Curated annotation (Swiss-Prot):
One of its GO terms (molecular function) is zinc ion binding. This is Putative carbonic anhydrase-like protein YbcF. It comes from the Bacteria. Belongs to the beta-class carbonic anhydrase family. Disulfide bonds: none annotated.
Length: 175
């Protein structure tokens, strides 16, 4: 993975310490050309949410031409699992589950537990696809997904395969 040394590269990463040096080496990006947005799970939940807004600003204000959405291999948000198990949350979660399943487009479908504990590979693939097909992201911007795997003591990087959905917005928004 060779990145043009003079171009800014945006990394949307999980909240994990120590990823930047690994990513600099893997992508051949210098520290001064590296921009980072961190969120739990490196997830973009909505095509017009705050994280996507930050990505778009970075593209236009910092001349970003390449974006990497980076997750930790097969990591699940354990905090989310703890939230759904709290007794004080059960009624709220039941109400939210109803909304998730019956009040689209405001909610994503599924359950609160699925939303909080989504698999990292699915999250990365969806986020890459959402950025790639967003109407405000120029077609020249390359968007790739990466996983950092810490097994065996030495981190390794794997590229996420392309997902070909072709749309960043739900079907009901396109009609």
């Amino acid at each position: 993975m060779n990145v043009n040394q003079n171009k800014k590269v945006l990394f949307l990463t999980d909240i994990e310490n120590g990823l930047e040096p690994i990513l600099q080496e893997a992508t051949n990006t210098s520290a001064e050309n590296m921009l980072t947005i961190q969120s739990y799970g490196a997830s973009i939940s909505h095509p017009y949410g705050e994280i996507m807004r930050s990505v778009i600003f970075a593209i236009y204000q910092e001349d970003v031409e390449e974006i990497f959405v980076v997750g930790t291999k097969d990591k699940k948000t354990s905090a989310g699992n703890g939230l759904t198990q709290l007794e004080t949350m059960k009624d709220k979660i039941q109400t939210l589950d109803y909304l998730f399943q019956n009040c689209k487009p405001e909610f994503l479908g599924g359950t609160v537990d699925e939303w909080l504990n989504e698999n990292s590979s699915d999250t990365i693939e969806k986020s890459v696809d959402m950025i790639r097909h967003h109407p405000l992201v120029p077609s020249y911007v390359k968007v790739r997904g990466l996983f950092v795997n810490h097994k065996g003591g030495k981190p390794s990087i794997a590229e996420v395969p392309d997902v070909k959905t072709g749309q960043a917005m739900p079907d009901h928004c396109l009609s």
